Amino acid sequence: MKYFSFSFFLFAISPMVLADNLTQSFQQSKQQFNEFQSLNQNRWIQQHSFQFITQQPKNDSLSKACLNYQGIQFKGVTLVKADHLLPKKEECINEERLNQLSQQLTQEYIDKGYIHNPFQFEDDHSGLLTLHVFEGKTAALESDDKQLNLNQLLPNVLGTPLKVQDLDQALDQANRISGNNVTVDVLPAKNGEIRLSFSNELTSRISGSIGIDDRASKNYGRWQARAAVNIGNPFGLSDTLYLSGAHTLKSRYQFNRSLLLHYSLPYGYWTFSSFASFSQFKSPLILENFSLQQNGRTVQAGISAEYVFHRGGNHISTFSTQFEKLNSKNRLEDVVLALQSPKLSSISVGINHLQLFENGNLVVDLRYEQGNNRGQEQPESQFKRSNLELKFNRYQALDSELFRHSHQLTGQYASHYLPSVKQEDLTGYNRVRGLNDLNLSAEKNLISHNDIAWIKQTKIGTFSPYLGFDLGIQKSVNEDQREKALAYAIGLNWSYKAFQANLEWATGRLFDKSDGVKQERFISTNFVYLF
């Protein structure tokens, strides 16, 4: 196989021009992976609602007359520290004080996550009143769905005190599976123990979508077809299998296509995943007097582990680590372009936090990646980068109308050269809109993507007209060049049963010191059928 960077024959061709198609091809794979992550996040948000703090009602009918007890003692209390709740010496013990003690002790257990701890008062006529707590331990797991693998969802829970975090985590893992709608009843057993009875209103194990849009590059004729399939519990391990693909529709001689396969396996607070993606393109490179055929492909595979290290009624925080390998090969005719053919291996760590509010939600994602580049004739053999993503959605009611504010902030920082497949995009549908044919990416960038939508329910579906505004800035480490971009857009989303559609008109402007101001307008459409 012949390798070269640029011969005299191609001296006038910019390396960025040669890299554009490879970058566009890999963008398709990145978009599929981002859609999969957004699908899981949105599913979690839809299944949870903001939990308000409830106040215990005050009972004014309780007697304040002192009872004939010298004090109170606890029995069976091992999971919380509660001695500070006991009445002080010579304090009046009455019905009101006993009710207060019961509520305070219950709250101590709830604050620690223990939700089933029945108790009773016992009088042995010694002058001390005993508050006997039966700390609920899990005695049995039951389910009306034999395909629900409870050992994967609640490992090592039998014989241990039940925590609400364990139960919430198990329900989250179960309801990530396509077609599942799992609920649980906490039922009493013997000696204060409990049994957990799971119920599943199963629909279909297979779900997915088929769609078409015109958001591909002009070079590929705009139109592309997309499809995704989500298979729940394929191996009976409460696991999920996700497959998605996209293909431009111009011709078989000039195309961009990609495929993503993702598999995840839950185990309590852990989720283990593996994935593989493939992207490929073919396109002519038009020169002044002739044209050359450019083609390339990128193969990516990896494994990851995610651990939920903290969760509450309105939030969930996870730590994740991922190892991946990526191999790109870009050819001009039968010659491999070494600079645009990196071979990468990397490891990354990240923290994700998802927070619910009364009328909105926030997603924070921080990630650091470090890796090696073993491709030939690469500028640097190692790379490092840090990424930030913030998503905030808020619903606001004005009189009888409902509005949604959607804001996304993404950023990347790298102090040294990054291969093009690891650079972040400045332009695109989910970045700065309207500039779809300007493929701009760099090591450092910051982008704000914003929409305000009016949500209107009608007999023929939900209509959401919206206004959009984007801002972005990027800088390359190899060139003293900085680009700025802004865009404004107007669009309409529509959904009815299994059908979804989008129409958007966007204007983007690029500010460059060397080339001045460039402006593009882009009208895009998207049609999706869900099954």
Predicted features and spans:
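Gram-negative/organellar outer-membrane beta-barrel architecture
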Residues: 164-171, 175-360, 518-530
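Short glycine-rich, acidic/polar surface loops and turns
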Residues: 451, 477, 485-493
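Sec-dependent signal peptide recognition
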Residues: 2-10
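Predominantly the C-terminal beta-signal and adjacent terminal strand-loop region
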Residues: 495-531
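Periplasmic polypeptide-binding modules associated with outer-membrane biogenesis and secretion
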Residues: 20-216, 246-257, 409
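Transmembrane beta-barrel strands of outer-membrane/channel proteins
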Residues: 186, 210-214, 227, 241-247, ...
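C-terminal outer-membrane beta-barrel translocator/porin domains of Gram-negative envelope proteins
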Residues: 331, 337-469, 475-477, 511-516, ...
